[in-house]
Amino acid sequence: MNNPCGPVPLLFITGFLGSGKTTLLNRILDEAAAQGKKIGVIINEWGRVNIDSSLIRAKDIEIEELNDGQVFCSCLSGNFLEALVLLAKRSLDVVIVETSGMANPFPLRNILCDLKRLTGGHYVYQGMIALIDPESFLDLVEDINAVEEQVIASQRIIINKIELADGETLARIRKKIRQLNPHAG
């Protein structure tokens, strides 16, 4: 599983349902395809049926689907590691994980340690991007722990669909994000 070109970047995209994860993923895939890059994608859905994989437009990608749970919990973390080990056997330039909207990334550090052990350092963690829907974020972050944990764990936070929110709401969202994660870009 040693990659002659160095470790393969591993990037996570997270955010609650409707925040724009699949749209962002499609944009990244379109850009990567234009550059001739080979991409591996793991799509995680909370339910039994994976809707997002049918929305992925790019053709030259390797897709693994993990349904009926979230990749960071014990119910799917073993399958998640297996999918990453499988993708490590392919010649890929980057692997992107689109998490379930309910994903709580708290156990990520342990998963990354297990992944390093299983793949011999094949991957290099490039961070997590959290997408925020301004219409629902302020309510969700108070009611659903996973939303708060996604913001805390992310290196980049994107407030998506800003045209749908007024200036006061955006200011409150930015303030909440800074409270939870002052180091995110």
Identify the meaning behind each predicted range.
Residues 2-14, 19, 23-140:
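Nucleotide-state-sensitive switch-loop elements of NTP-binding domains
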Residues 9, 76, 104-107, 143-153, ...:
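Helical mechanochemical/support elements of P-loop NTPase systems and associated helical scaffolds
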Residues 148-185:
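Canonical P-loop GTPase G-domain recognition
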